[in-house]
């Protein structure tokens, strides 16, 4: 059954609905018609505010009608409609929102004095309506102007209505049992409308105070500050403060900004970017803003408390966008604004950030966290900031003078400058991938021009303070040459080796980008010059030429006017031919560039990573990252994105990596782990290996594929294996430290065993292509002789070849030969020792020397097995029997470039095999290789009693 309170609510809503309708028709509609098409800005603003008030009044009337309808249904049909169906209870937030919108629109008009300004345009009409306006007021009378009466008529009915709402709801609550279904709804409505009553009184007071403020300001200040949305919260004329260092005459705290007045000038601070910090003195309050730090000094601590409380609450209100203040001293819990915020701001003060707009996270008035910084000239920086400076990963876009050209920096930053690893794509189409320090290239890095550049180049090496310095490789594609050596101040300086596309290479000392003093020049025809010469390889000054045939020319050289070469010296034609190892196989760079110090710029960041304890958030900064080139995207600001692993992912993955590493310490498990790690581009070891591969390719591939660099390359691969093992040990040490354990010391013998036996086989495939090419070039002559010998021996049928090689007949595997009816043993070809031959052919399918030696051992086993089967008993081959049989198998296997294979095995094999079976078999294979090259393997050296027809 409905109560008397519900009936009172119904009557209250009926009265308020009628009052609202009369207010709309008597006041708001005539106000809109007073000047429907104003021409001045002030008139247009007043019309906009009145239209907004009219719309909010109509919405409030509509909500009141809905509430009235729900009350009628409740009173006239109580069994079917419970109390909880009443709109005022079931949807109290909706009702509250309509009231809030009306209050906002009304106070905007009060602040802008819209009623007074518009009413003056139809003053006669409004004077005639004074009596009707007074009837809307509860007292029935009103003193003051028409504008004042109008304000009261629009405000008083609402204030009284909300007050009566609250009283009736309180009375209704008392009539309900605690278990009543609507009890909770009633309590919620009481809370909402209690807050509304407080808010309304505060909002009206603020609007009146703000309206009064405009009269106390000069016209210039009023034009700057006057806004319908402004609400004055505190004035220093009420509670005086002394401001330093700006020396403001007056301080105004609005709901969205803090304003300092200095004569006709204003300093306005957005409250979203204001931080409040109490001073040590109880009368001092510090205000932090993006570009100013100011202090308020009050006369007494009470004044400081008021200012601190009001500024703090104003900041909270600005951040949450709600004008909902508790009354000072009401006992409500004071809100505390967050230290970290996300706001946009444009810097004004002269300096690096002048006119730049920062949009992102802040902390204590400084950009801090993720954000975007944009300048009017088109510069952009997207990334992380720390205490106001770029810090961490960021992408910076810098426009060039030419249209649609940008420099794009994808780098790590520290204290506002590029630091550690980054990728920079310049408007010139050059790309730099490497390390920085203090905004300059520093450490290891690769700078490469666009392929279509007029003078294409690529530099791979070390930098110091933005200049090439230390060991580095530069490829000049226009000249077709590659420089391998030392640099200083962006110039070739110190020892260096130059390799040309034509196959010529020379070594000397450079100073100021030019050769200084004598050098060594090796030509493609294996002639050697020792002396002074120019960069274009013109012999100049004293020197000595050693020709391939052994002749020497010692004297002085100069160039003639007709581009000829003039010399004055001694030609010695009686000299013996030089040792091939002194000219054709002469190696450059050995001892000149100690292998331990060549790529310190690659190893150093990894060591720093280990020294810091392998922090995941520092992995890509120290070890690098890879992104797709955005050369096309750089033409627009769309390139402010980067395809790289998320830094948060690196933190977790690094911890997992260290844990996994501890689980794979046994030999077999360790081998599997290292194979997986080295093939993973995100694993620290995999990242290091990929960088080392880049340096190796930059040095020895393409133009650098020169036989005179073979030893330099093979010692570099071994050094990389040693460094990678040290890197693994470093990771293991950190992983153990995380577990509170220590890593046992490792002696040199154990280290060498692990490097050659474990790690070198795993990394050699990464360098094999370039390394084996150097072996091919170095042993090209011997392999040519060997190839001709193989061709000659292939003319023999099997039995003739066995006979020619002096293989004892009782060892011939004739039982393995299956002849057709018209075949003879003497005609069979490529059938004897077939399993051994097929086994040896697999040597070219393997990479590591250990695997190649295992193939050789299996081949030896197949030869012995075949002989044992022929003899019908187990038979161990003596060297006298083995060599002819091995020559036979080698000739039938027809392995190309066997010399390169043998020397690679010899140079890269594990020292543990020295003196063992593998060493013995490799020596035997070398003997076969050398024997096949001999003159007696040529057709004209075959036994005279052999007719060529007999070979078939």
Curated annotation (Swiss-Prot):
The keyword Lyase appears for this protein: no
Record key words, sorted: Cytoplasm, GTPase activation, Repeat
Domain named VPS9: residues: 795-941
Localization terms from the record: Cytoplasm
InterPro entries assigned to the protein according to its UniProt record, in alphabetical order: Alsin_GEFs/MotNeuronReg (IPR051984), DBL_dom_sf (IPR035899), MORN (IPR003409), VPS9 (IPR003123), VPS9_dom_sf (IPR037191)
PROSITE patterns assigned: VPS9
GO cellular component, one term: cytoplasmic vesicle
Tissue spec. comment: Expressed in heart, lung, liver and kidney.
GO MF annotation terms: GTPase activator activity; identical protein binding; small GTPase binding
A Pfam family matched in the record: VPS9
Complex formation: Homodimer. Forms a heteromeric complex with ALS2. Interacts with ALS2 and RAB5A.
Protein name: ALS2 C-terminal-like protein
Record organism: Mus musculus (Mouse)
Lineage of origin: Eukaryota, Metazoa, Chordata, Craniata, Vertebrata
């Amino acid at each position: 059954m409905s109560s008397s309170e519900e009936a009172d609510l119904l009557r209250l809503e009926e009265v308020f609905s009628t009052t609202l309708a009369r207010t709309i028709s008597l006041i708001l509609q005539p106000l809109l018609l007073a000047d429907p098409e104003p021409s001045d800005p002030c008139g247009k603003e007043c019309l906009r505010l009145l239209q907004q008030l009219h719309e909010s009044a109509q919405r409030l009337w509509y909500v009141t009608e809905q509430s009235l309808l729900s009350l009628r249904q409740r009173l006239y049909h109580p069994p079917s409609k419970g109390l909880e169906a009443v709109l005022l209870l079931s949807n109290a937030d909706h009702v509250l929102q309509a009231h809030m919108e009306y209050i906002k629109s009304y106070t905007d008009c009060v602040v802008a004095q819209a009623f007074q300004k518009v009413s003056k345009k139809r003053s006669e009409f409004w004077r005639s309506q004074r009596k009707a306006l007074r009837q809307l007021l509860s007292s029935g009378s009103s003193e003051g102007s028409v504008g004042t009466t109008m304000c009261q008529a629009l405000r008083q009915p609402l204030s009284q209505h909300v007050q009566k709402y609250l009283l009736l709801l309180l009375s209704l609550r008392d009539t309900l049992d605690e278990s009543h279904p609507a009890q909770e709804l009633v309590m919620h409505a009481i809370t909402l409308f209690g807050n509304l009553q407080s808010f309304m009184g505060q909002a009206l007071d603020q609007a009146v105070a703000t309206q009064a403020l405009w009269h106390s300001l000069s016209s210039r200040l009023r034009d700057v500050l006057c806004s319908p949305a402004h609400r004055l919260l505190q004035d220093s004329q009420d509670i005086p403060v002394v401001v330093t260092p700006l020396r403001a005459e007056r301080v105004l705290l609005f709901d969205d900004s803090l304003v300092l007045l200095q004569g006709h000038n204003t300093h306005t601070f957005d409250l979203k970017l204001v931080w409040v910090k109490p001073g040590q003195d109880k009368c001092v309050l510090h205000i932090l803003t993006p570009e100013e730090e100011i202090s308020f000094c009050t006369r007494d601590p009470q004044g400081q408390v008021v200012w601190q409380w009001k500024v703090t609450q104003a900041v909270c209100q600005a951040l949450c966008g709600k004008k909902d203040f508790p009354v000072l001293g009401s006992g409500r819990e004071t809100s505390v604004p967050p230290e970290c915020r996300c706001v946009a701001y444009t810097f004004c003060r002269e300096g690096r950030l002048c006119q730049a707009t920062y949009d992102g996270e802040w902390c204590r008035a400084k950009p801090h966290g993720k954000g975007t910084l944009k300048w009017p000239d088109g510069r952009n920086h997207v990334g992380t900031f720390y205490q106001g400076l770029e810090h961490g990963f960021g992408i910076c876009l810098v426009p060039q003078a030419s249209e649609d050209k940008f420099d794009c920096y994808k780098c790590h930053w520290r204290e506002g400058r590029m630091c550690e690893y980054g990728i920079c794509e310049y408007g010139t189409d050059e790309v730099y991938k490497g390390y920085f320090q203090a905004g300059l290239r520093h450490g290891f890095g690769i700078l490469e021009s666009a392929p279509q550049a007029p003078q294409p180049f690529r530099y791979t090496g070390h930098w110091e303070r933005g200049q090439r310095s230390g060991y580095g490789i530069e490829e000049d594609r226009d000249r077709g040459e590659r420089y391998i050596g030392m640099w200083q101040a962006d110039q070739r300086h110190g020892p260096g080796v130059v390799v040309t596309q034509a196959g010529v290479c020379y070594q000397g000392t450079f100073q100021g980008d030019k050769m200084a003093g004598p050098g060594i020049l090796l030509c493609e025809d294996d002639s050697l010059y020792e002396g002074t010469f120019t960069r274009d390889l013109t012999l100049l000054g004293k020197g000595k030429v050693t020709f391939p045939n052994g002749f020497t020319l010692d004297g002085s050289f100069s160039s003639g006017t007709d581009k000829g070469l003039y010399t004055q010296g001694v030609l010695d034609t009686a000299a013996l031919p030089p040792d091939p190892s002194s000219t054709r196989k002469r190696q450059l760079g050995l001892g000149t560039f100690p292998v331990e110090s060549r790529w310190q710029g690659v190893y150093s960041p990894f060591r720093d990573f280990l020294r810091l304890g392998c922090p995941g958030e520092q992995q890509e900064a120290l070890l690098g990252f890879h992104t797709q080139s955005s050369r096309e995207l750089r033409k627009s600001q769309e390139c402010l994105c980067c395809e790289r692993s998320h830094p948060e992912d690196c933190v977790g993955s690094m911890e997992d990596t260290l844990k996994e590493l501890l689980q794979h310490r046994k030999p077999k498990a360790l081998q599997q782990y290292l194979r997986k790690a080295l093939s993973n581009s995100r694993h620290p070891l995999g990242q290091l290996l990929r960088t080392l591969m880049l340096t190796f390719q930059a040095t020895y591939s393409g133009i650098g594929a020169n036989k005179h660099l073979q030893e330099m390359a093979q010692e570099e691969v071994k050094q990389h294996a040693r460094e990678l093992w040290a890197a693994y040990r470093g990771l293991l040490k950190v992983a153990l430290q995380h577990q509170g354990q220590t890593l046992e010391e490792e002696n040199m013998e154990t280290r060498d065993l692990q490097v050659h036996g474990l790690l070198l086989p795993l990394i050699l495939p990464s360098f094999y292509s370039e390394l084996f090419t150097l072996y091919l070039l170095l042993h090209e002559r011997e392999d040519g002789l060997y190839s001709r010998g193989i061709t000659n021996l292939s003319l023999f049928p099997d039995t003739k070849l066995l006979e020619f090689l002096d293989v004892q007949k009782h060892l011939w595997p004739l039982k393995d030969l299956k002849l057709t009816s018209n075949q003879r043993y003497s005609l069979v070809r490529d059938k004897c020792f077939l399993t051994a031959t097929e086994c040896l052919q697999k040597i070219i399918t393997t990479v590591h020397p250990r695997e190649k030696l295992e193939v050789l051992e299996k081949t030896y086993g197949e030869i012995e097995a075949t002989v044992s089967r022929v003899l019908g008993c187990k038979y161990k081959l003596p060297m006298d029997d083995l060599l002819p049989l091995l020559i036979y198998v080698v000739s039938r296997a027809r392995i190309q470039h066997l010399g390169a294979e043998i020397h690679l095995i010899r140079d890269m094999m594990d020292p543990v095999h020295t003196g063992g079976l593998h060493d013995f078999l490799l020596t035997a294979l070398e003997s076969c290789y050398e024997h096949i090259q001999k003159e007696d393997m040529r057709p004209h050296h075959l036994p005279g009693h052999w007719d060529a027809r007999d070979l078939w």
